[in-house]
Amino acid sequence: FYGDQKRAPEGPHLLKKDGWYYLFEAEGGTGEGHRITVSRSRTLMGIYEPCPYNPIMRQWLPDAPIQRCGHGKPVMTQHGDWYIVYLCGRMIDQKYSMLGRETALDPITWTPDGWPVVNHLQGPGCQQKKPLPEIPYYSKDKDTGFGTNFLSCDFMTPRTPTLHGIQIQNGILTLEGSHADL
């Protein structure tokens, strides 16, 4: 299967739902044409028919904050609500994405004829309502205890930080900002 738009399909995700195999793909390269399309078949090996609503996720507005949406994976909550987790970028001057690819989440609704539609085909949402009760990531009452020369796991970072500008003395953590490229 060469994708709906036949332009660089990649990153497939399969979902079996209600007797259908759904194939979610990223298409259009990783630039401004990046999008999520879906096709389905009654059998795993196809023939797959493209969704009449494709692309089910794409940013159509060139000045919108979220761009380059692709690589969507559908997920269902324990309450039966559907969402799509996907990659995107927040662009600066329509050229750069300071944080690279970010992860986003938007709701999926299913049409009466069984097709997934993301965010009512309005493109990526900037905010979503939380369907679950808030669970704090950390306790506000927790004592971080800067009494040692080491930071606890609560201060882990997704990248290897430079340790320049970080000091722990007399139970006080001091962080000095720096000029650094991401």
Predicted regions and their residues:
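Carbohydrate-active catalytic/glycan-binding domains of CAZyme proteins
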Residues: 1-182
